[in-house]
């Protein structure tokens, strides 16, 4: 057994013993998030942006848009694409190069949560049906990784979308060209999906796992909900099994915690307008 494995075993035993006493390694309750800070409009050249600090985890999201063609199977819908970059300085486990499995999973789950909740109304992003639509790029940069990237990215992504203002455009039927106007308008964001992540350590579920907790967890589940009472994404990862009653508890708690976070997002967006 290597020294790293011995240290990991000691840490796991310590964390589990604390959990059995109703405590966490950082003194939070089982359903408590670390402090959440949200600041929007932080990238001057982006059409929307948000910086989120979740404890020591930090992520930056920028929104850019362009005009392009719709996908052939959705001619009357705009396009949204999500990309996650794990900046090497954020963690010794992040390496330069193309997106790895972690980045792909993060992007896929966040994209699904927004898309399936219809938070961004893609039908309202059509300029010329079947020909020209608005294309929205959600670019995520992880600046510091101290656990629970999923929730930090999800919060930052929807906050940045709410913050975005894009140039108004007008289609000239006579010339067949799209004219870009001087005015701007918000993106058609109609819901606020929020992911809530649980780590299972032993037989106990904790919200918003820190990096230390993630290193010893048996499994992880993320549940994304919106304010209309719908679940738009569920992602289980890192192995492990969840009993039905554990999943039901996670769903109930996810709705409750998401509502709290949603208020913080709206407060940050409104503050930036003042």
UniProtKB/Swiss-Prot annotation:
Signal sequence region: none
Any one Gene Ontology molecular-function term assigned to this protein's record: mRNA 3'-UTR AU-rich region binding
Disulphide-bonded residues: none
Biological processes, Gene Ontology terms: rRNA catabolic process
Pfam families registered for this protein in UniProt: RNase_PH (PF01138), RNase_PH_C (PF03725)
Predominant localisation class: cytoplasm
InterPro entries (UniProt xref): ExoRNase_PH_dom1, ExoRNase_PH_dom2, ExoRNase_PH_dom2_sf, Exosome_comp_Rrp42_subfam, PNPase/RNase_PH_dom_sf, Ribosomal_Su5_D2-typ_SF, Rrp42_archaea
Superkingdom of the source species: Archaea
Compartmental location: Cytoplasm
Keywords (A to Z) from UniProt: Cytoplasm, Exosome
GO cellular component, one term: cytoplasmic exosome (RNase complex)
SUPFAM superfamilies, per database record: Ribonuclease PH domain 2-like, Ribosomal protein S5 domain 2-like
Similarity-based family: Belongs to the RNase PH family. Rrp42 subfamily.
Subunit structure: Component of the archaeal exosome complex. Forms a hexameric ring-like arrangement composed of 3 Rrp41-Rrp42 heterodimers. The hexameric ring associates with a trimer of Rrp4 and/or Csl4 subunits.
Function statement: Non-catalytic component of the exosome, which is a complex involved in RNA degradation. Contributes to the structuring of the Rrp41 active site.
Protein name per the record: Exosome complex component Rrp42
